[in-house]
Amino acid sequence: MSKLIYIMGPSGSGKDSLMAEARLRLAAEAPVVFAHRYITRPADAGGENHVALSRAEFQLRLSRGLFALSWESHGFAYGIGREIDIWMESGLSVVVNGSRGALSAALQAYPELLPVLIDVPEHILRERLGARGREDAGEIEARLVRARMAVVEAPELVRFDNSGPLAERGQALAGLILETTISGRKS
């Protein structure tokens, strides 16, 4: 049974690494695909593998209804393409890298989605943000404040601790994705 699995969490929580690890650990025959995001950020900016679009390209796609989900965050526009609907109609579960701020809209569009909040203790979040080298100290503090203030509530919300070793946590996420896909249950 196909499901939309909506991964979200604060910057630095390890979503990209965790999703990449889970993707590697899912068997090739598993009926699961990982959607890429369309972002108005250069492709070489670091972080996830995404489709880089100019603002004009993004707006054109948005105006033509080519995004299943879209939102703005940290000065960039993000979109998940309508192709996810085709994938789910064909029986595949789809994993997306979403946004806490866009969860409400995602639930309206896909009421049966499984929301997964990636969580790590603040000291680990601070460490990871510093290690990636994209933000200065002030920007890191601002992200930590946003992470503390963000309240994520949703039916069936799964809080997923990502403070352990990547291989272990990736295997656990792959297990959650596969269990959700096979059972058709939200959690």
UniProtKB/Swiss-Prot annotation:
GO molecular function, one term: ATP binding
Protein EC: 2.7.4.23
Domain of life, per lineage: Bacteria
Keyword Transferase applies: yes
Matches recorded under SMART domains: GuKc (SM00072)
Gene Ontology biological process terms, A to Z: 5-phosphoribose 1-diphosphate biosynthetic process; organic phosphonate metabolic process
Catalysed reactions listed for this entry: alpha-D-ribose 1,5-bisphosphate + ATP = 5-phospho-alpha-D-ribose 1-diphosphate + ADP
Residues annotated as binding ATP: 9-16
Enzyme class, first EC level, given as a word: transferase
InterPro entries the record matches: GK/Ca_channel_bsu, P-loop_NTPase, PhnN
Alphabetized UniProt keyword annotations: ATP-binding, Nucleotide-binding, Transferase
Record pathway: Metabolic intermediate biosynthesis; 5-phospho-alpha-D-ribose 1-diphosphate biosynthesis; 5-phospho-alpha-D-ribose 1-diphosphate from D-ribose 5-phosphate (route II): step 3/3
Role noted for this protein: Catalyzes the phosphorylation of ribose 1,5-bisphosphate to 5-phospho-D-ribosyl alpha-1-diphosphate (PRPP).
Similarity remark: Belongs to the ribose 1,5-bisphosphokinase family.
Protein name: Ribose 1,5-bisphosphate phosphokinase PhnN
Organism annotation: Desulfomicrobium baculatum (strain DSM 4028 / VKM B-1378 / X) (Desulfovibrio baculatus)
